[in-house]
Design a protein with these regions (language model features):
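N-terminal post-signal-peptidase region of extra-cytosolic proteins
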Residues: 60-64, 75-83, 100
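Short acidic-glycine-tyrosine-enriched beta hairpin
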Residues: 109-126
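Glycine- and acidic-residue-biased ligand/ion/polar-headgroup-sensing regions
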Residues: 80-83, 90-108
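Ligand-binding loop in jelly-roll beta-barrel domains
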Residues: 125-149
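Extracellular/periplasmic catalytic domains that process cell-envelope and extracellular macromolecules
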Residues: 54-57, 68-70, 89-90, 97, ...
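Conserved short histidine dyad/triad with adjacent acidic residue
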Residues: 73-90, 124-126
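A short, N-terminal "cap"/entry segment at the start of jelly-roll beta-barrel domains
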Residues: 24, 28-73, 156-160
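Bacterial N-terminal signal peptides that target proteins for export
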Residues: 2-18
Length: 160
């Protein structure tokens, strides 16, 4: 029977290889606990909930992933065509992709941006902004929040 004694550099390599393999298997089990998800905005199974009262009538939110009361939630946000979204801000930064419609967004101190389907926009945390969904609506946006989901009306925002 052949037996090799591992010492020095060979021992270090063997230990490091073992640790890397163990880490890979441990990481794989963590990632495997959560199933993958795909979702379309037209899915009739989506559960659309209400928006805060200062936002337009007919507005809706659908939670896609995560808990909106915790960090890292993803939502669809929907407003009817020809709706005005009054000035507001979010505690969290928001990453947005317009799914449908045409949305004109104005962040305080910045030029109005015209979002068309497929357009990505980034909104920094606490930066007030307003928007208008044009007649190509409804406007449906995918929004990824880093912090819990909220919308705080800016001073002077009218309640609808």
């Amino acid at each position: 029977m052949y037996c090799r004694i591992v010492t020095g550099r060979s021992l270090k390599i063997a230990l490091m290889s073992g640790l890397l393999l163990a880490g890979a298997f441990a990481g794989a089990s963590v990632f495997a606990q959560e199933p993958p998800l795909t979702q379309t905005a037209k899915d009739p199974k989506l559960k659309w909930g209400p928006c805060p009262p200062f936002l337009p009538k007919g507005c809706g939110l659908a939670v896609l992933h995560g808990d909106p009361a915790k960090n890292n939630a993803d939502v669809f946000f929907k407003v009817p065509a020809n709706s005005i979204i009054p000035s507001h801000w979010h505690t969290s930064a928001e990453r947005i992709v317009l799914i449908s419609g045409e949305l004109h967004v104005t962040y305080d101190g910045h030029k109005t941006a015209v979002l068309k389907p497929g357009t990505y926009a980034y909104g920094p945390a606490k930066l007030p902004h307003k928007a208008e969904c044009k007649n190509a609506g409804p406007c449906i946006l995918f929004i990824a929040f880093e912090s819990p989901v909220d919308a705080v009306p800016s001073e002077g925002a009218s309640k609808k």
